[in-house]
């Protein structure tokens, strides 16, 4: 894989102590599939993932979930507010698709204000261009 397409190690939370700081000092936000701990910092965007064996006993499935979430963060990291983001995956995420995981993570990030809201289609077009279908 091309190195520019990877999620760099410097953008990951690796140490147990860093996870504890995010858990204890960060704000917590929840959805049905994920729980997000956000700790604003002055440094770069960093991601930590927690997928326990309770989610799925098979490592293959846990790794699939982590890869999917890491890929979403890689694609949007430049848009995010700087800070540490720790994503804890819930048991309900075991049988969902990668697309559903992506939507769940993006909606949590929008809810906390770390990611700008999605643009509304045709928001900048004049009223008559939105509602008329001329041919």
UniProtKB/Swiss-Prot annotation:
One GO location term (cellular component): ribonuclease P complex
InterPro entries listed in its UniProt record: Ribosomal_Su5_D2-typ_SF, Ribsml_uS5_D2-typ_fold_subgr, RNase_P, RNase_P_CS
GO molecular function: 3'-tRNA processing endoribonuclease activity; ribonuclease P activity; tRNA binding
Keyword tRNA processing in annotation: yes
EC main group: hydrolase
Record key words, sorted: Endonuclease, Hydrolase, Nuclease, RNA-binding, tRNA processing
Enzyme Commission number(s): 3.1.26.5
GO BP field: tRNA 5'-leader removal
Keyword RNA-binding attached: yes
Subunit annotation: Consists of a catalytic RNA component (M1 or rnpB) and a protein subunit.
Family designation: Belongs to the RnpA family.
Task performed by this protein: RNaseP catalyzes the removal of the 5'-leader sequence from pre-tRNA to produce the mature 5'-terminus. It can also cleave other RNA substrates such as 4.5S RNA. The protein component plays an auxiliary but essential role in vivo by binding to the 5'-leader sequence and broadening the substrate specificity of the ribozyme.
Protein name: Ribonuclease P protein component
UniProt source species: Xylella fastidiosa (strain 9a5c)
